């Protein structure tokens, strides 16, 4: 599956990008600032991993941020798959669909 396919896993998704572990964009589709979003994902990784370790949650795989105007989803698999979309009442479900589809990239 190409990165464009990620946008079809749930309604309201409008941009997706794939990057390496440093946040350097490899592929992007849709309406988003891929460079900035992938850089944010890379910068969030270390503090979120530390929080996960302190809480005994295991390794970081996925994370998402929901805000009034939309949501930011990140699947971590050595690199990142970053997706932006509109607000959702079920961000966990969308994150699971993105992670599943990202495994096919």
Segments from the language model and where they lie:
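Non-catalytic interaction/Regulatory regions outside core domains
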Residues: 1-105
